[in-house]
């Protein structure tokens, strides 16, 4: 998240623009986490795979993994995917979109691997998060049009929305390092 914040600060001219993007990202997380944790999970009351007595013996649980709340549906999947969709629509760069979606999917995979969610929890989280990310971007776009924030760039060094390719590459390096760290930690669990 820090790398995304850096990208926003470095590539927007006014505090109003930066604030609106940060507010949009925060709105994604609040809508995801708030609705899921305060409304859906308590109503669904679905046990996590690692807490389900009928499944617990079938799972190879990673030591130190323990979750006390309910499973349906995955807030991690919804949060990361809503942020991925919001920033993909905001930045409009194919390589960035590919990496931020990969980051979200790796996060989702960890939820399955650790046994804290069923596949359906993750799929519903992705669907919900995608809808939230797109809806928040549409709202962000409408507010930008009212406030007359208009950027249009035609250069090989910038995206169509004015984000410097060099800054995007820095964020991609951070995402690659996070993904490599996740893979490395997964391998260490087997050693």
Where are these regions (language model features)?
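Hydrophobic/aromatic residues in alpha-helical transmembrane segments
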Residues: 1, 35-36, 83, 132
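Hydrophobic, aromatic-rich transmembrane alpha-helices
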Residues: 1-11, 80-88
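Interfacial segments of alpha-helical transmembrane regions
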Residues: 5-36, 97
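Transmembrane helix-bundle signature of multi-pass membrane transporters/permeases
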Residues: 6, 26, 30, 57, ...
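Hydrophobic residues in alpha-helical segments
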Residues: 8-9, 44, 112-113
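Transmembrane alpha-helix/helix-exit interface in multi-pass inner-membrane proteins
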Residues: 29-50
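Glycine/small-residue-rich loop that forms an oxyanion/phosphate-binding "nest" at active or ligand-binding sites
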Residues: 51-52, 58-60
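Membrane-embedded catalytic cores of phosphoryl/pyrophosphoryl-handling enzymes
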Residues: 60-190
């Amino acid at each position: 998240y820090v790398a995304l914040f850096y990208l926003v600060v470095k590539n927007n001219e006014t505090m109003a623009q930066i604030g609106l993007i940060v507010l949009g990202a925060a709105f994604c997380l609040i809508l995801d986490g708030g609705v899921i944790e305060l409304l859906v999970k308590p109503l669904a009351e679905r046990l996590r795979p690692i807490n389900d007595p009928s499944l617990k013996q079938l799972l190879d649980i990673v030591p130190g993994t323990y979750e006390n709340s309910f499973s349906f549906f995955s807030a991690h999947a919804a949060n990361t995917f809503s942020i991925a969709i919001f920033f993909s629509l905001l930045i409009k760069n194919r390589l960035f979109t590919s990496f931020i979606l990969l980051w979200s999917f790796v996060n989702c995979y960890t939820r399955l691997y650790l046994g804290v969610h069923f596949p359906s929890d993750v799929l519903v989280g992705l669907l919900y998060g995608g809808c939230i990310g797109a809806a928040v971007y549409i709202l962000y776009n409408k507010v930008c049009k009212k406030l007359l924030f208009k950027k249009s760039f035609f250069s090989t060094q910038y995206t169509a929305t004015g984000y410097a390719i060099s800054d995007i590459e820095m964020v991609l390096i951070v995402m690659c390092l996070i993904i490599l760290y996740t893979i490395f930690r997964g391998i260490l669990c087997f050693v």
